[in-house]
């Protein structure tokens, strides 16, 4: 018996069944496909309680039966290996089937463990992505709220019946003293119709200011007033237009759209064309920008829209006027001053 145990130890390898301290074989059924012939014989000696000299062990060695061939053995093969002993063959076949089923269960368990690991990794990745998307959404929402808050807080408010320029998100209206109204956008637009006071917002309209060369007395009454810019029809112009040709004081005039790159000369010509003024007389007119209580003549090569935006950002509430050149000298004479600022002080 000791010689048999010694033979078992010598024929074992890394994938073979192990022996405990009592000499009992510890089966590694999941590795039986890697067993050698000696490993198979060792397993048969342990499970069937046979000697190494048993015909089964001899037939296994003669036929070179290794571990991966065991599941292929049928009952008849087992009976031939057992030298016609049916009882031993049945027992041998049952042990082979149990070992095969054990390996399949082990594979299923390993597959399930792998699937669980993959699902956990997928869950972790998905959770991280969702958290990242949530953070991005929160930042985007805060940015949008800040923009809306800034936009709403920077909008001018009309209080106590005082008419102010109310820019919309698309058009910035630039009033004109001769009834010309310019708006800061990319293209020239058509007529904007006035809306009723019941509307919450309406296009800003400008009314004609009389030429200063018509009457000195008229200037004395209104020299400290600027053209009224009304956001609805309930606020008419504060300047009378008696004896002034053109539209009536309460008539909404046309509005122009201009881009940032348009020069003063181009805007001036388009304004005159839009309001049916003679094109050949365009040098008799000038564009004047008013901000605070100051007025300044715009040179032909300047960019009125850019200047308008810069002054607006400084909170000076600018407005651009279309005037005749002769009006400025008359204003200086009536004021009795050497101030050559076009249009004088508002």
Swiss-Prot record:
The modification Phosphoserine is found at residues 202, 248. GO terms for molecular function: protein kinase regulator activity; SAM domain binding. One of its GO terms (cellular component) is cytoplasm. Residues 151-187, 227-245 have a biased composition (Polar residues). The modification Phosphothreonine is found at residue 244. GO terms for biological process: establishment of cell polarity; osmosensory signaling pathway via Sho1 osmosensor; p38MAPK cascade; pheromone-dependent signal transduction involved in conjugation with cellular fusion; regulation of cell cycle; signal transduction involved in filamentous growth. Residues 233-327 form the Ras-associating domain. Keywords: Cell cycle, Growth arrest, Pheromone response, Phosphoprotein. Residues 151-250 are annotated as: Disordered. Signal peptide: none annotated. The keyword Membrane does not apply. Residues 24-108 form the SAM domain. Pfam families: RA, SAM_Ste50p. It comes from the Eukaryota. Interacts with STE11 through the respective SAM domains. Present with 1670 molecules/cell in log phase SD medium. Involved in growth arrest during conjugation. May interact with the G protein alpha subunit. This is Protein STE50. It comes from Saccharomyces cerevisiae (strain ATCC 204508 / S288c).
